[in-house]
Amino acid sequence: MDIREIQAALPHRYPMLLVDRVLEVSDDHIVAIKNVTINEPFFNGHFPHYPVMPGVLIMEALAQTAGVLELSKEENKSKLVFYAGMDKVKFKKQVVPGDQLVMTATFIKRRGTIAVVEARAEVDGKLAASGTLTFACGQ
């Protein structure tokens, strides 16, 4: 999926759109990338002399990745997905300008409109962040 297809699936726009490309997608698994550049607005304040991507934005990028997976399904194309929670979140590596986040999300449980995914973000094959994310699919 290119950026136009991602924008067709997600309601997010600059500066909050944190998925640049989807590399692979199946019924319950997705791999996407975020190219992190010094031009990201959050680097102005986090931190001016030592730019590091905020962990919460890494988790948001993972949530958006899972959102693309859910919203690309035919039955969900006109719906919104709401981030309902996260558990077991771990940050293992700082993400800095020039890094490419490779993000994966795999659905592990569904019940009605609620879905749970295992998500990971890696840089150069090393784990940067991971967690279990919960979503609610709205109307």
Swiss-Prot record:
Main location: cytoplasm
Signal peptide: none
GO-annotated biological processes: fatty acid biosynthetic process; lipid A biosynthetic process
Keywords, comma-separated and alphabetical: Cytoplasm, Lipid A biosynthesis, Lipid biosynthesis, Lipid metabolism, Lyase
Gene Ontology molecular function: (3R)-hydroxyacyl-[acyl-carrier-protein] dehydratase activity
Keyword Zinc on entry: no
EC number: 4.2.1.59
Subcellular location: Cytoplasm
First-level EC class: lyase
Chemical reaction(s) catalysed: a (3R)-hydroxyacyl-[ACP] = a (2E)-enoyl-[ACP] + H2O
Pfam entry (one): FabA
GO annotation, cellular component aspect: cytoplasm; membrane
Lyase is among the record's keywords: yes
InterPro entries: FabA_FabZ, FabZ, HotDog_dom_sf
Active site as annotated: H46
Gene3D superfamilies attached to this UniProt entry: Hotdog Thioesterase (3.10.129.10)
SUPFAM superfamilies documented for this protein: Thioesterase/thiol ester dehydrase-isomerase
Protein family membership: Belongs to the thioester dehydratase family. FabZ subfamily.
Role noted for this protein: Involved in unsaturated fatty acids biosynthesis. Catalyzes the dehydration of short chain beta-hydroxyacyl-ACPs and long chain saturated and unsaturated beta-hydroxyacyl-ACPs.
Protein name: 3-hydroxyacyl-[acyl-carrier-protein] dehydratase FabZ
Organism: Streptococcus pyogenes serotype M3 (strain ATCC BAA-595 / MGAS315)
Species lineage: Bacteria, Bacillati, Bacillota, Bacilli, Lactobacillales
UniProt gene name: fabZ
